Amino acid sequence: MPATITGHGENQSVTRAIDILNLLADNAEPLGVREIARRFDLPASNVQRLIKTLAKAGFLEQAGDTLRYSIGYRAFQVGNAFVERSSLYSAVTPELYTLASNHITGFLGVLRDRSVVYLSTVQSEGPVAITHRPGSQTHLHSTAMGKALLAEMSD
């Protein structure tokens, strides 16, 4: 996957750092500098500097004694700040717990880039467990929430 092309007024280093964060967020296993550089067709020295900066800020963590990296605690904190400050989240969360107390699993999701991004799941005590971890993204056609969003969209 080539690095994202930056547009007018965008900062290439910031764009590349975001690309690295997205890659590591989507990957279950930690990745090394050379592998990341290869995926973006970038010099390893450039990727190394970006990773070092992201790691120093807590957005990436080195996996044990390896030379591989994964998402760090600071990325979690930034994402959590979004949810905590969301008026939608604050308004809907009590209703999700009401649903769960009535044996219905409740989901909060938003439409982003023609996908559903889940912000919260409150699991009921029912026999069937359907979960979407916060931050996960699904295609609109593959979930009931996505289909409900599609039904309300204009052609």
Question: How should each PLM-predicted stretch be described?
Answer:
Residues 65-155:
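Amphipathic alpha-helical effector-binding/dimerization core
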